[in-house]
Amino acid sequence: MSNPFVQIVEPLDAKEPVKKFFNLSKLEDVRYARLPFSIRVLLEAAIRNCDEFLVKKQDVENILNWKVMQHKNVEVPFKPARVILQDFTGVPAVVDFAAMRDAVKKLGGDPEKINPICPADLVIDHSIQVDFNRRSDSLQKNQDLEFERNKERFEFLKWGSQAFKNMRIIPPGSGIIHQVNLEYLARVVMDQDGYYYPDSVVGTDSHTTMVDGLGVLGWGVGGIEAEAVMLGQPISMVLPEVVGYKLLGNPQPLVTSTDIVLTITKHLRQVGVVGKFVEFFGPGVAQLSIADRATIANMCPEYGATAAYFPVDDISIGYLVQTGRDKEKVLCTKKYLEAVGMLRDFKNSSQDPDFTQVVELDLHTVVPCCSGPKRPQDKVAVSDMKKDFETCLGAKQGFKGFQIAPDRHNSVIKFNFEGCDFELAHGSVVIAAITSCTNTSNPSVMLGAGLLAKKAVEAGLTVKPYIKTSLSPGSGVVTYYLRESGVMSYLSQLGFDVVGYGCMTCIGNSGPLPDSVVEAITQGDLVAVGVLSGNRNFEGRVHPNTRANYLASPPLVIAYAIAGTVRIDFEKEPLGISASGKKIFLKDIWPTRNEIQAVERQYVIPGMFKEVYQKIETVNEAWNALDAPSDKLYTWNPKSTYIKSPPFFDGLTLALQTPKTIEDAYVLLNFGDSVTTDHISPAGNIARNSPAARYLTSRGLTPREFNSYGSRRGNDAVMARGTFANIRLVNKFIDKQGPQTIHFPSGETLDVFDAAERYKQAGHPLIVLAGKEYGAGSSRDWAAKGPFLLGVKAVLAESYERIHRSNLVGMGVIPLQYLPGEDARTLGLTGRERYTIIIPENLKPQMNIQIKLDTGKTFHAIMRFDTDVELTYFHNGGILNYMIRKMAS
């Protein structure tokens, strides 16, 4: 059927009649001008894609009527303009695509129908680790090791880029996905197939929201959902509430964008924005650069919103020019946005739209801060850090407690490193990493760090040699301006050499600590510290030996590295003593905003962006030399320990199976609150005594060849064994942290995988019990695929993080939620019961269903299939099964 809104199509420029757009101002509907700008993007996509099948006229009306419909839990479809993937989530996506081609062929269909319809970019940034640091050749050494470890994965991805149309691979060594997206891939306005329309994106990484800072609406989705979008399916989403976040005033001189985002994160966690859009407005926005806005948007998952949108304004347009985008295209971008009423003037309050609610922040009230020691939302003012850490030491085990006995608070362990004697104590910094797209995309904080390093070196300050220091920029542009401005050599003198272009320490690829440091930490049971300019600091994520991890701005990372401890009051205690005996305080070396801006104006210029990005796809010689097969169907290598055909589609037929009641399920694990996807499916090192290690050893590998869980996401045998394998897992069945559980029929304590295998062999279904925020953190599809392979049929939790619930749905695992006011405690659940979950034939979205226990007790829970489309996926056994049946029939 033709588009019912064709009457509002017109050329953007009369001189170019072939280039058209849907002119939303021609709707002549007064509601349009009151819509939040983020909702206008959803509306335009619905109008442009309206076909009365996937997108209906009623969907358009529901979005236009947002002010009323936002409270009605109404489902709307959204077709984003692009998909982005990183390699940890991208490899399993390409594995699934290859396996789907095989499945379609087996069912008699055309395998080449499995092909991205929506354009996809895959940026390889998650594989590189900090094996080498504090040496001039660290970058080359780490990149060589990356290729040695990941050659097979990289060959597979190169095959994918050739076998599938519409899929572009950005090679390793190019930068971090979100920074590359911001500086290079993002268009703001698309010019495709004869139409102009707003750029929008979904990505298989939760920090995809970073590009919201440029005015490109985007957010993270599960890998499974992203695959469906690539195959032309719209995202089915509940029309969101939009919280207006009003920024007022100017930041104080010493405050960085990192301080602002950590303040906003804590504030919005308290407001409660899960499942909502946040849209920024107010005169304070005009004080923020695009890099500052992108930093704030990047940490959107940490405050729990779906998107954190900054509408496009003249500063956004200026950023496109600054980053070397084509000037003619930039002019068209501005002209289009003006025509459709999507160009914002933050100083003009008459443009302020309607919001669900409005909250405010005066930027002048923000003070320098960090977040930690275990969660991004736990903000601590720098002036309070010493006192806060010392309180955490003795506090009860929890997000703000380590339960260290008072008589051990001042324990000191002596150790030798490279022939010199040193001491470690609670609070000693052992990792200091300038890392992560959150901050390395921001010239003001990166140049601030460089200028602070210069002043520190000139004052005679140093960093202790055992501290693992590193600098992993999000793109080559950063190195370019640090070098050109003359600060790179000072960073190197403090140990902050460039170690790679990728996520690195921020995702746990921090590499090993020196043996003597690990021995000292272990001997003293010390709460050692990592300080990083990252976006997440969940327990066990950054490094197994840093129990406390603080998020901080790049200049503060260097300051704490010089101090060597977080038990310092920077206002009263010096960082060190100069050669002349003078006490040097942090305020003595902290650069002013004027100093930073002067350097930024001189050295961050369009030419450097053009130079770096024009050769991004061809500059990596090792990638160019990779040999990849050219077949359209992948030839699986049975000896491979990286790439394996997954069992998800084994035995799939065209006929649907009726979902059955889950009978007498055992509880595999019993969790409390805030179990993250890092707990469920860790990305870091494979422990030598783990089920995954035993499997890899049986395949002839040595521990040096294990690599990380993240790198092995193309192999289901490793990933199933790595499910719930986090060493910091807290399972209520077990009285200590670790990846174990009780196998109830035998009463034995086993590794989680081994227990699940025993249940499976006996034919027993499994469920998981959890508290609030189950599945928080990274958009990790293996956190749903892994439990599915272990035989988990359902999860019963108090609440879910959005992306993880969607991933469970995508795998056909039932997300159940306690009724309001109920939880495991109020219902008296111990997890030792057996659970029968009644699945009625007439399922409806968010239906209350009955659960019977073997004790005779009965209660109800909400089945969190939120839309009719999600129910369709469930009836098919998951979203990918649905797509295969659709393509094969």
UniProtKB/Swiss-Prot annotation:
Predominant cellular place of this UniProt entry's protein: cytoplasm
Cofactor list: [4Fe-4S] cluster
Superkingdom in the source lineage: Eukaryota
Keywords: 4Fe-4S, Cytoplasm, Iron, Iron-sulfur, Lyase, Metal-binding, RNA-binding, Tricarboxylic acid cycle
Gene Ontology MF terms: 3 iron, 4 sulfur cluster binding; 4 iron, 4 sulfur cluster binding; aconitate hydratase activity; iron-responsive element binding; metal ion binding
Record's catalysed reaction(s): citrate = D-threo-isocitrate
Amino acids binding [4Fe-4S] cluster: 437, 503, 506
Its EC number(s): 4.2.1.3
Places the protein is found: Cytoplasm, Cytosol
This protein's GO CC annotations: cytosol; mitochondrion
Bound cofactor: record note: Binds 1 [4Fe-4S] cluster per subunit.
Binding-site list for substrate: 86, 205-207, 536, 541, 699, 779-780
One GO BP: citrate metabolic process
InterPro entries: AcnA_IRP_Swivel, Acnase/IPM_dHydase_lsu_aba_1/3, Acoase/IPM_deHydtase_lsu_aba, Aconitase/3IPM_dehydase_swvl, Aconitase/IRP2, Aconitase_4Fe-4S_BS, Aconitase_4Fe-4S_dom, AconitaseA/IPMdHydase_ssu_swvl
Family statement drawn from the similarity comment of this UniProt entry: Belongs to the aconitase/IPM isomerase family.
PANTHER family for the chain: ACONITASE/IRON-RESPONSIVE ELEMENT FAMILY MEMBER (PTHR11670)
Job description of the protein: Bifunctional iron sensor that switches between 2 activities depending on iron availability. Iron deprivation, promotes its mRNA binding activity through which it regulates the expression of genes involved in iron uptake, sequestration and utilization. Binds to iron-responsive elements (IRES) in the untranslated region of target mRNAs preventing for instance the translation of ferritin and aminolevulinic acid synthase and stabilizing the transferrin receptor mRNA.
Protein's name in the database: Cytoplasmic aconitate hydratase
Taxonomy of the source species: Eukaryota, Metazoa, Chordata, Craniata, Vertebrata
